[in-house]
Each structure stands twice: as structure tokens, then as C-alpha cells.
């Protein structure tokens, strides 16, 4: 999931005045949806459809709008604001191939600083700024000619999803009951994207450089820019400081510090009690037990039990003409090596589900998917025919396990070499997706993911959270504990 870079021309500044605002009781938020779609397209698509999963719309366009309204209602019940939140919504032909696609994106279309009710010299997303100010800060400002220049949030979703040239067969599921099967759950996807627009994003920091936006909202600058409202809550455990007190160079490094950036807001830290004990993989070798290894379960295949024997580990060797490890059907040598075992397969060149399915077809009983760069991975993908368990581990862990498998062989016989036996367990002293102090971690892979890095929860969280960089099939439409941590973070920044 991506949060798009906002238009710099949409950044706004309000000079604080000495006026006294009248206190008024907070009320439930109101969200209005403004369609950008022309007749016969997107929300206005007249294609007849059957009701699905509680969505009673009779046309494709109507069902799409019904999901928007359903998700907006969820946010309305969870937020308080005396100012209407406006969302510009449209369906567009976004980037696609037969095997991948941009699902959609959303973000705050305007950002504000120095308005009554906000922290001085701090950037806020528009919907939150309006709530804190108690007024619509764009009121009276002429539109920029687009028709949506003064909205709070702008969203766009891929109108071609599921067509042969656009992630073929994986269309949006428009039901409201979460039973998406192999389709993409549009309600969960939209709930996530509106979360970005409401403020789940560092928004005014360029993560590739660490630069902030200047007070005028006209450019990212190395020095002198204003911080995001997020920054005081972003604490780097390596640098031992928060982003508010970092240089641009330090923020750039922190954005690619795997498992190193924690969120310190009181609501989120309290809510992090919902996180489960850290799942670990134990590996017993002929000479002893390796240190516990963190893992993240794959999004496909059977659910991994908390405690279980996984099996004997194995490695594979490169095959002639392969595009990447495990990306083609296994040859005779690799099939013999992994039959009845758990191969360690490195990431790269094809989808995780493809690698696991090829291993399954060769007789594997499970798969460990090792990252090919530093940092954790939570293997995504979908294939209902995968019936063996799999999980993601770090590159360093994969290298250590491969070395252990090679070192174990001499401890057996030629007919039956020594093996490394893997099992699943948990570490009750640590929370999955949190640092040593129990503070939830942000997404900071070692290779920057523009639009995703920092502005999501980390992928090691368990249970899966709405604001991770991918939409997991087990998500509910809840934004608060005990299912989720989205609302606690939004409360930390002022909601």
C-alpha cells in the first residue's frame, strides 16, 4: 500500500493570532465523499452486479460507493470533529502488469502549520488541523481549478484491477463481510488508505533525504524546515533520539534502520499490550541449539501453530536457466535434497507463493523464506493450493541456517547425513512488532520503500495490523484494540 507524496502547492499556512477560540463540545466526525468520476465510469459504472457480502448495490458503481460509505461510517464512529472531513474519490487506470498492480493510494491533500489549536511550527494533515482549529481552514480559499484543491483527503483506486493485464484474476471484493477469498478486500484496503489521509503518515518529511518542508510549503529543505506532528513520537533505538531532534541526515538513516524505529505515543504503547509473544524458530544441530530466530508467518498457506516441530532443514542449489531461487520446478537433485524436509529459499525474482508451491510440488513439508537484504520480511502473496507452512526470516538468519545445515552433514553417515531440526516456539519476554520496552515498531526496511517506509507499522507485528504495508487476509474492520493500533496512534497526534 502507498501513501502518495502530497502536492507541495497544496500545503497551506495559517498565521496564529491572539484570538480566543470558543470551546465547543466535540461531536462525532462527519465524512463526505465527493466523486471525481465522469458518467458511466468508476462510481457511475452501470454494469449490473449481484449483491455480495451484505453489499446490496445492483450496479458496479453503486457497490463501489457503498463500500466507501461503509468505511467512512467506521471512521465517523471512531473520530470526533466539529468540522466535516471531505474526501475526493475517484477510480483511475493505475500502474498494472499481469502479475502486479498498484491497488490505490490516498493521502492528506492539504497540510497546515501555525493555526490556533495546533503545536507551533508543526505540520498537520488537513482533517486533523481542522479538528484542532475548530474551523475549516480552507473556507474562503479559491479552488486551484482541479475541483478538489480544498479537500482534506484525496483517494484513487485501480479501475482495471483483476483484468488480464492487471493482476489477472484478483479483482476488488466489494462485500462488507470480509469474506474476500482470493480477491482483494476493498473495504480493508480503503480503511487503510483513509487512515493515511487522516494522519497515519509522516507526510511532511522526505524519507529518502530526511528533508522537511519549509514553512511556506514550497519545497523540501535540508535545514530550517518544519517538523511533522509525528516526529516527537518517533524514537530511534540506535541513535537514541527522536526525529524531532535529528538532522536530515540522521532521519534519512533512521528510515532504513530495520526494527530500530519505535513509536512512543502513550496511547499506542498502552495499546501494544494486544501484541502477542514474539514467535521464534529454534534450530537444533548435532552440536547444540542455535540462538532463537525471529520469523513472520506467510500470508498464504496454513496457519502456523505457536509451538510445533517444523522438520529437518535443507538447502537447494542453483538450477540451470532459473530466474531465481525456487522460481522454477525443482530438478531431480533439489527434489531429492528437500523431499520430506524444510528448504531455506532466498527471496528474489518471483513471488513467495511461487517458491513455496514449487517446493511443495517437490515434496517439501514447509519452507523458510530468507530475505535477500538486511531486515525482516513478512511473505505476502496468495495461492489457495499451497498446503504447507512457510515463514519469512532475515538474510542473516537464512545464512546462519544454511551454514548449520552444511556443518551438520558430517555428523551423520553417508546414507543419512546429520541434520538440523527446526521447531516453532515463542519468547514470552518480547512482543511481536515491538521494541524491548514494548513500544510498537514502524516499518523501516533496509532498502527504502518510497511511500511505505516509516508511514506504516512494521511487518513483524502479531496479530497483523491494518496499517502494515500490505493488506493481510485476516484483518478485521476494527481500528482499535484489541484488534488494532490505528486509532491509538491517531489519538497520539491529536485525534
Predicted regions located by residue number:
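Short acidic, glycine/proline-enriched helix-loop-strand junctions
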Residues: 338-339, 372-406
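Short hydrophobic alpha-helical runs that function as membrane-insertion/retention elements
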Residues: 343-345, 366-371, 392
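Bacterial N-terminal signal peptides that target proteins for export
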Residues: 2-15
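Short secondary-structure boundary segments
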Residues: 371-372, 490
Amino acid at each position: 500500500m502507498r501513501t502518495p507524496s502530497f502536492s507541495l502547492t497544496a500545503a497551506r499556512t495559517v498565521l496564529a493570532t491572539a484570538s480566543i477560540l470558543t470551546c465547543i463540545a466535540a461531536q462525532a466526525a462527519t465524512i463526505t465523499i465527493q466523486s471525481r468520476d465522469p458518467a458511466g465510469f468508476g462510481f457511475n459504472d452501470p454494469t449490473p452486479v449481484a449483491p455480495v457480502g451484505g453489499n446490496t448495490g445492483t450496479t458496479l458503481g453503486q457497490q463501489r460507493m457503498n463500500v466507501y460509505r461503509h468505511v467512512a461510517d467506521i471512521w465517523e464512529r471512531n473520530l470526533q470533529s466539529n468540522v466535516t472531513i471531505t474526501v475526493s474519490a475517484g477510480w483511475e487506470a493505475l500502474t498494472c502488469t499481469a502479475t502486479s498492480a498498484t491497488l490505490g493510494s490516498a493521502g492528506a491533500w492539504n497540510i497546515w502549520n501555525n493555526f490556533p489549536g495546533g503545536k507551533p511550527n508543526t505540520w498537520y494533515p488537513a482533517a486533523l488541523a481542522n479538528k484542532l482549529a475548530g474551523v475549516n481552514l480552507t473556507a474562503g480559499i479559491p479552488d486551484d481549478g482541479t475541483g478538489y484543491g480544498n479537500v482534506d483527503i484525496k483517494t484513487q483506486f485501480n479501475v482495471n484491477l483483476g483484468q488480464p493485464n492487471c493482476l489477472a484474476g484478483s479483482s476488488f471484493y466489494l462485500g462488507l463481510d470480509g469474506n474476500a477469498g482470493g480477491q482483494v478486500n476493498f473495504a480493508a484496503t480503503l480503511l487503510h488508505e483513509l487512515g493515511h489521509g487522516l494522519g497515519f503518515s509522516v507526510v511532511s518529511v522526505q524519507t529518502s533525504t530526511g528533508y522537511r518542508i519549509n514553512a511556506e510549503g514550497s519545497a523540501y529543505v535540508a535545514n530550517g524546515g518544519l517538523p511533522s506532528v509525528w516526529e516527537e513520537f518517533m524514537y530511534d533505538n540506535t541513535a537514541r533520539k527522536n526525529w524531532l531532534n535529528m538532522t536530515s541526515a540522521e532521519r534519512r538513516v533512521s528510515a532504513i534502520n530495520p526494527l530500530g524505529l519505535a513509536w512512543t505515543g502513550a496511547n499506542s504503547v498502552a495499546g501494544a499490550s494486544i501484541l502477542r509473544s514474539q514467535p521464534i524458530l529454534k534450530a537444533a544441530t548435532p552440536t547444540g541449539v542455535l540462538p532463537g530466530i525471529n520469523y513472520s508467518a506467510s500470508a498464504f498457506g496454513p496457519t502456523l501453530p505457536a509451538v510445533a516441530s517444523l522438520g529437518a532443514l535443507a538447502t537447494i542449489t542453483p538450477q540451470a536457466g532459473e530466474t531465481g531461487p525456487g522460481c522454477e520446478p525443482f530438478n531431480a537433485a533439489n527434489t531429492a535434497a528437500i523431499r520430506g524436509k524444510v528448504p531455506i529459499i532466498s527471496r528474489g525474482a518471483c513471488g513467495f507463493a511461487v517458491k513455496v508451491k514449487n517446493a511443495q510440488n517437490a515434496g517439501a513439508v514447509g519452507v523458510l523464506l530468507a530475505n535477500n537484504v538486511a531486515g525482516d520480511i513478512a511473505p505476502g502473496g496468495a495461492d489457495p493450493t499451497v498446503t504447507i507452512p512457510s515463514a519469512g526470516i532475515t538474510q542473516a538468519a537464512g545464512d546462519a541456517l544454511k551454514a548449520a545445515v552444511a556443518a551438520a552433514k558430517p555428523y551423520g553417515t553417508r546414507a543419512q547425513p546429520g541434520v538440523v531440526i527446526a521447531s516453532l516456539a515463542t519468547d514470552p519476554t518480547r512482543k511481536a512488532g515491538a521494541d524491548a520496552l514494548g513500544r510498537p515498531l514502524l516499518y523501516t526496511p533496509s532498502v527504502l520503500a518510497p511511500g511505505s517506509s516509516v508511514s506504516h507499522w512494521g511487518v513483524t507485528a502479531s496479530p497483523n495490523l491494518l496499517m502494515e504495508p500490505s493488506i493481510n487476509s485476516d484483518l478485521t474492520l476494527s481500528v482499535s484494540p484489541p484488534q488494532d493500533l490505528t486509532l491509538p496512534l491517531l489519538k497520539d497526534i491529536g485525534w
